[in-house]
Regions:
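Sec-dependent N-terminal signal peptides
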Residues: 4-13
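Bacterial Sec-dependent signal peptides at the C-terminal "C-region" and cleavage site
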Residues: 14-24
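Short N-terminal segments immediately surrounding and downstream of signal-peptide cleavage
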Residues: 22-42
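Conserved SGNH/GDSL esterase-like catalytic core that processes O-acyl groups on lipids
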Residues: 37-38, 46-125, 129
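A structural signal for well-ordered alpha-helical segments within the folded catalytic domains
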Residues: 50, 54, 209-221
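Alpha-helical cap/lid subdomain in secreted, periplasmic
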Residues: 95-209, 221, 230
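Conserved catalytic region of serine esterases and O-acyltransferases that act on ester linkages
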Residues: 206, 216-262
Length: 262
């Protein structure tokens, strides 16, 4: 009952988002499921709090014992970077990272400031399409990690920024026929349900541990098309049982609502 109510509430939030303007994801699951090697590409939003890819790997280890992807999940990050700052040509080369011949899935995370102006959004759109094309040409799959928005006291806080982020990431996914992972929406819905929860650091931009945990749950649910609810992983007890279940349910309901909106 609790999960059903949460899903219905999030569905209402989705109805008031940019989806009212028919901006909905066209791709709702990976064309080739269960990727055995995954590369995260982004900035400090990924590497804070022991790195999102490590939390994600531990969830994969728990859900799929012996799954090869658990040792083939890597991350390439540059602090403060935007999409254009990453050398995809190099990252896609065989054994550019470890002994991995080819990453079956490449998850792209853009910079926090790429939605602040029309010029920035256009540059993001162009780079997103270029990167996705390179990834697909390599025989890999591309996915876009929709970032969270700023919160106060960040100087660029704007309550409507998440709508801009949502629209630009959905457009990037639709233009390249790539999966979009709705991390930013999960943050929004978590705050709607529990305004007191701390998903951001004090700077209003970087994720706190609970933010990274929520993001990992959202990526897990999106990539594997499976619910994270019930996972035992709690980062060695640093995520409380209450927070763990809440964030797992938020991730599950966000992903279900986002993909069902199309």
């Amino acid at each position: 009952m609790r999960k059903t109510i949460l899903f219905l509430l999030i569905s209402v939030f989705v109805g008031h988002s940019s989806f009212a303007d028919k901006t909905a994801p066209e791709i709702t699951k990976l064309k080739r499921p269960l990727p055995k090697s995954i590369l995260f590409v982004g900035n400090s939003y990924l590497y804070y709090n022991d790195s999102l890819h490590n939390h994600f790997k531990r969830m994969v280890d728990e859900k799929y014992p012996g799954y090869e992807g658990s040792k083939n999940v890597k991350s390439s990050t540059i602090g403060g970077s935007r999409l254009k700052h990453h050398n995809l040509d190099h990252l896609l080369k065989p054994e550019a990272i470890s002994s991995i011949k080819k990453f079956e899935l490449v998850i792209l995370q853009g910079g926090s400031g790429e939605g602040l102006s029309k010029k920035d959004r256009e540059a993001f759109a162009n780079t997103a399409n270029e990167h996705a094309t390179k990834i697909e040409t390599n025989g890999s799959q591309a996915a876009f990690y929709m970032i969270h928005a700023y919160v106060e006291p960040h100087e660029n806080f704007d309550p409507n920024l998440i709508r801009v982020i949502e629209k630009m990431y959905v457009a990037a996914g639709n233009n390249s026929q790539s999966l979009v992972i709705p991390v930013g929406l999960a943050f929004e819905y978590a705050y709607e349900r529990r305004p007191d929860i701390k998903l951001h650091n004090l700077d209003g931009t970087h994720p706190a541990l609970l933010g990274s945990y929520l993001a990992a749950c959202t990526v897990f649910a999106s990539v594997f098309n499976v619910s994270p609810v019930g996972l035992d992983y709690d980062y060695n007890g640093l995520v409380s049982t209450r927070d763990k279940l809440f964030l797992q349910e938020i991730a599950e309901s966000t992903v279900r609502s986002f993909y069902r909106s199309s």
